[in-house]
A protein has these predicted regions:
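Transmembrane-helix signature of 12-pass secondary carriers
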Residues: 1-214
Length: 214
């Protein structure tokens, strides 16, 4: 069994959990800045923070069928793009409406990542490692939340509109996630069930667990 390779691809995919946690928590440090900049009422502030859930619902509902049709890997790549766009647009937003739209886009990424990342890991991980590797995603969510708080702390005293840096810094790990996903194979289970590409799936399974596992 190529344990290191299996852990490697699982860790990359689980970075979606990190972005999920980071995106969920980072807004806490930016609340003061966005309230002043966009001149928000209490209702507008609450909606701008909570609107992510609407995107997450949409992402969660659509990610499953899309991943069944186009593959887990492609949907995860799309979530990475959504995280990158959301972080960048949120940081550059000049109006309340576009800020909310950017936040909802990030929510779609959250809804997709929280569903598809553990599915992918479960489909590539050997039975002996499956439980611990799937839990990587949950661990990364907690790490992402923690990193967001530390990031906000170190960026809060920057001159000018520090909230833009707080929200925009997420684009860096999101783009890294986007690039890293191209190094992971497509789900062997999906390749067989959807495309009947037994030979292609077999190559991945051999790389993960050897010929006996395949």
């Amino acid at each position: 069994m190529n344990k290191s390779y299996t852990i490697f691809i699982s860790f990359i995919v689980a970075l979606g959990g990190f972005l999920l946690g980071f995106d969920s928590a980072v807004i806490s440090g930016a609340v003061g800045g966005i309230t002043v900049y966009f001149n928000m009422s209490d209702w507008e502030l609450g909606f701008s923070v909570g609107c992510v859930i609407f995107g997450a619902m949409a992402g969660n509902i659509t990610a499953g069928p899309l991943s069944d049709k186009f593959g887990r890997k492609k949907v995860l790549i799309i979530t990475a793009i959504l995280f990158t766009v959301s972080a960048t647009w949120s940081a550059l937003a000049t109006g309340y409406t576009e800020f909310v739209i950017a936040r909802i886009i990030g929510g779609i990424g959250i809804g997709g990542a929280i569903l598809i990342a553990p599915i992918y890991i479960a489909e590539v991980a050997p039975p002996k490692l499956r439980g611990s590797l799937v839990s990587l995603n949950q661990l990364n969510i907690v790490i992402g939340i923690s990193v967001a708080y530390f990031s906000n702390y170190f960026l809060k005293d920057l001159e000018g509109e520090s909230w833009r840096w707080m929200l925009g810094v997420e684009a860096i790990p999101a783009f890294v996630y986007f690039l890293a996903l191209f190094t992971v194979p497509r789900s062997p289970r999906w390749l067989i069930q959807r495309l009947n590409l037994v030979k292609v799936a077999e190559k991945t399974l051999i790389k993960i667990g050897g010929k006996d596992y395949a």
